Amino acid sequence: KFADENFQLKH
């Protein structure tokens, strides 16, 4: 996924 990675990066 890309959204999952984005979420982890954002948090």
Swiss-Prot record:
It catalyses: [protein]-peptidylproline (omega=180) = [protein]-peptidylproline (omega=0). GO terms for cellular component: cytoplasm. It is found in: Cytoplasm. Keywords: Allergen, Cytoplasm, Isomerase, Rotamase. Binds cyclosporin A (CsA). CsA mediates some of its effects via an inhibitory action on PPIase. It is an enzyme of class 5 (isomerase). Its EC number is 5.2.1.8. Its main location: cytoplasm. The keyword Transferase does not apply. GO terms for molecular function: peptidyl-prolyl cis-trans isomerase activity. Residues 1-11 form the PPIase cyclophilin-type domain. Belongs to the cyclophilin-type PPIase family. PPIases accelerate the folding of proteins. It catalyzes the cis-trans isomerization of proline imidic peptide bonds in oligopeptides. This is Peptidyl-prolyl cis-trans isomerase. It comes from Penicillium glabrum.
